[in-house]
Structures are given as C-alpha cells and as structure tokens.
Amino acid sequence: MIIVLKQDAPDVQVREFCHELEDMGLQINDSKGSDTHILGLIGDTKAIAESWVLANPVVETCRRVSEPYKKANRKFHPDDSVVDVEGVKIGGGNFAVIAGPCSIESEEQITYCAQRVKAAGASLLRGGAFKPRTSPYSFQGMRSEGLDLLKLARRATGAPIVTEIMNTEHLPLFENVDLIQVGARNMQNFELLKAVGRQKKPVLLKRGLANTLEEFVMSAEYIMAEGNENVILCERGIRTFETSMRNTLDLAGVVMLHKMTHLPVVVDPSHACGHAWMVPELAKAAVAAGADGLMIEVHNDPAKAKCDGAQSLTPDQFDELMGFIRKEVEFFGKKMN
C-alpha cells in the first residue's frame, strides 16, 4: 500500500501515524520528494481498511500496489534515485561511463587502459579479476592479484573501480572496491544478493540472460531489503532466437525499467552484441533510450585479449565514440560525470 501525505502535515502527527503502522507489524519506506511525501508500506496490508487510512488527518490519499517489489518501485519513490560512487553520480539526470578491459591481464595493460579511458572521459574504471566463463578451460582471471592491479590503476588515474564478485566468500576481498558488480549469471544468486545488500558499497546488478524485467527488479529488491539501496541496474542483452549476435539488446526494457523503478539504469552494449563494430551505434541508441550510463569494454590490443576481444574497442575507437556520446548526453539534457 502507498500512502500519500498532505504537504502541510505536521511532523508530530506524521510520526504518530507511522508508529501506529509499525505497531501493526509493517515496515515503512519513507520517501519525501520535492512535491510529494509518500509512505510505502511493506508487509501484509490486507487487514488495513483504506477508509481507516483516509480518516487520518495527515493523509491525502492511498492506494494498493500489486507489484511484488516495493523498495525498488517508482510508485513508492517517485523521484529518480541518484547513486554516488566516490563522487561520481549516476541517475537523476547524471550520466556516467564505465570503461576498461573485460579482464585484467597485467599491470601495464590495466594501467594503460585506465589512463586512456579516463583521458577520454570515462568516470569509472572496469576490469575483471574473477571471470565467470562458459568453458572451464578458458582464462578465469587473475583473481586477487587482479584486484591488486586494479587498485594500482585507480591510484594512477583517480577513477573509482568496478569489478565483479562471484560468490559470498570473496566479499572480504572487495572492501576496497568502489562499485561491486553482480554479473548476469549471478542475478538470481539470492545468498550473494543478500550478502551485498548487507554491506554499504554501491552495487551494479546485471540482468540475467533470460530473465524478465520483473525478475530483474525483484533481484534488486533482495539487495535493497537488506538495507543497501544504492543499486544500479544494467541491461546487457538477453538471449533470443537470433544467432548473428552474442545477445539482443533490450532497449525497450530500458524505457520500461524507468517506468517500473526509480533506480538508475545503465547499458552494456559490448556484451549485448559481441561485435566491436556494433558497440558505438548501440551505445548511441542507449543514450537516446534514456540510459543513465554506459559500460563499455576497451582493450589496448583486442586481437590478443584473453577474454572477449571481439567486442572490445581500442582506446582510439573509444576516444572517437566519447566525442559523440558527450554531445548526445548534453543534447538530452543530462549532466556528464
């Protein structure tokens, strides 16, 4: 249930009303925007009569919500959420680009890529240390050593770092990571979602290969229900009958997610197609669809990359793309971070 309070409702009376609701065993998601003050009730509200709610002098109106997600629901929180990653803001009119190699291969490689993407305008540095691969014989990443190299690249550039966590046992290793990524294959790893929800670092949650938008948002709800509401959603393409591309980018899903939820939505055009030549056009389309950011793979020598070289841009290609993206973001009235 959503309760809209009167703008001039006295704080004392609002607190008293909230205490009454909490005494009924309900959790309250209190969202105060520029024009509205909303109480989102989480729990069993079937026994609460709307007439009883409306009789309270602080209440403007109320309505029941059918969606299973509450904290992530835009009806509970009408204003866009802004997630701050070490000073880089994403959402609410703020646009950020995350860039870097799919996997960390050496200190020289990650440092060079970091310096180039930062100079081109990327706000955050990505780099895979733990790699979930389809084949057990493929490169699995440099693991904890890779994390150390990623931190060195952060020191060299000042850019906050983003990397993927594979399981709950790795969480202590991620204390110095600025934005923790939960990958597509772990989107419904509920124990991992709860674990990252219990810590305070922002979380980048990628959509699963064959998950609906509601399932995607419900995974974000798992994180938020544990107390961490700094969640960024990432559309990275879904599996369809089409075989000419690695995945199919769901740009309609980006638009729909902004209607469903107040959380920021970024797009990964690299994984969405699997072809570097397609990445620039998909990135431009994502901005036009209202994305709050991009996540792009950049490698100094894609032909020799140990992971996903075919979808990685060179630093020069990324430079050229960023020149266009910067103008496009400005055209659509967003602020480039």
Feature map (PLM): residue ranges:
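Active-site mouth loops of central-metabolism enzymes
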Residues: 95-112, 135-140, 160-164, 183-185, ...
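Catalytic alpha/beta core domains of metabolic enzymes, predominantly
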Residues: 199-298
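Glycine-rich, proline-tolerant flexible connector loops at the mouths of alpha/beta enzymes
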Residues: 126-144, 299-310
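Non-catalytic terminal accessory/regulatory regions of metabolic enzymes
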Residues: 1-97
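Catalytic beta/alpha-barrel core
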Residues: 6, 142, 158-169, 178-191, ...
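Conserved, mostly hydrophobic/aromatic
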Residues: 53, 100, 125, 174, ...
